[in-house]
Amino acid sequence: MKFTLEDQVVLITGGSQGLGKEFAKKYYNEAENTKIIIVSRSEARLLDTCNEIRIEAHLRRETTDEGQVQHKLAAPLDLEQRLFYYPCDLSCYESVECLFNALRDLDLLPTQTLCCAGGAVPKLFRGLSGHELNLGMDINYKTTLNVAHQIALAEQTKEHHLIIFSSATALYPFVGYSQYAPAKAAIKSLVAILRQELTNFRISCVYPGNFESEGFTVEQLTKPEITKLIEGPSDAIPCKQACDIIAKSLARGDDDVFTDFVGWMIMGMDLGLTAKKSRFVPLQWIFGVLSNILVVPFYMVGCSWYIRKWFRENDGKKAN
């Protein structure tokens, strides 16, 4: 199933910011016959996003903006309109059912779905609140689980491209990401199972590295120094660049997608009983085997030493 921007009905969760918002812009600007539905919890942010995308497009094309537009997904549907929003708590299964009932009633069941909703609260485990722990599973796993299940029920015979966003931390979890990485690892397992069960679907999984977004800026406020030390001097790439890399990889046929070379290397070292569907898979396996023998043992010893040393020197900060 070829990835294309044109002639689609695309559902984008987490569409009011970050990569979800960037993909909504990409579909709106580069396709002419695609309907785009963005979903998140905040109706105000969704409306702002729709207006921003529409106005930016008119400025780019030097055309006149059509003024106030009813972007909210509801009947009667303007057949000329291409961008819609639907406020929904995707962590609540009943709310997702209502979303798909609305899509079904309006004959807008998606042909492509991008599950972009998510976010991290990087802190040491003792410093997290119960609310933050629950939020990690709600927005990083349940949002995708609920949407994927409804799509599977709605599209039992038709082809569908389901694009799920995990994280490089699913392949290499480390200190500071206890609220986030386990949920993203669960996404990785879910993808492996859905690829076996949903034979009429193309299922892609994206493992982004750091990219500039509102969420990334907020994460830096709570991220422990030891987390930054292990991450290394990895600069966040622009969100648009990450979006373009992902779209290009999907169009090329890759179904395990990375935004940087580090992610590709880490997946090579993640040897397991799941099929790899990334670029240069044979080379990735060879690299992974050699790295696991020659590099990983020494790296992990050094990493463990740095973590223990940091905690000894920052004994009073263990809950921060």
Curated annotation (Swiss-Prot):
Topological region Lumenal: 276-279
GO CC term (a single one): lipid droplet
Transmembrane segments: 255-275, 280-300
Catalytic center residues: S166, Y180, K184
Subunit and partners: Dimer or tetramer.
Keywords per UniProt: Endoplasmic reticulum, Lipid metabolism, Membrane, NADP, Nucleotide-binding, Oxidoreductase, Sphingolipid metabolism, Transmembrane, Transmembrane helix
Chain location of the short sequence motif GXSXG per the record: 14-18
Function: Catalyzes the reduction of 3'-oxosphinganine (3-ketodihydrosphingosine/KDS) to sphinganine (dihydrosphingosine/DHS), the second step of de novo sphingolipid biosynthesis.
Catalytic activity: sphinganine + NADP(+) = 3-oxosphinganine + NADPH + H(+)
E.C. numbers: 1.1.1.102
CDD domains attached to this UniProt entry: KDSR-like_SDR_c (cd08939)
Record-level Gene Ontology MF annotations: 3-dehydrosphinganine reductase activity; NADPH binding
Membrane-side (Cytoplasmic) residue stretches: 1-254, 301-320
Family: Belongs to the short-chain dehydrogenases/reductases (SDR) family.
Major enzyme class: oxidoreductase
Protein's recorded name: 3-ketodihydrosphingosine reductase TSC10
Gene3D superfamilies: NAD(P)-binding Rossmann-like Domain (3.40.50.720)
Binding site for NADP(+): L11, L19, D89, Y180, K184, S213
Keyword hit for Protein transport: no
Residues at which NADPH binds: G14, S16, G18, R41, R45, D89, L90
A Pfam family recorded for this sequence: adh_short
Localisation per UniProt entry: Endoplasmic reticulum membrane
SUPFAM superfamilies membership: NAD(P)-binding Rossmann-fold domains
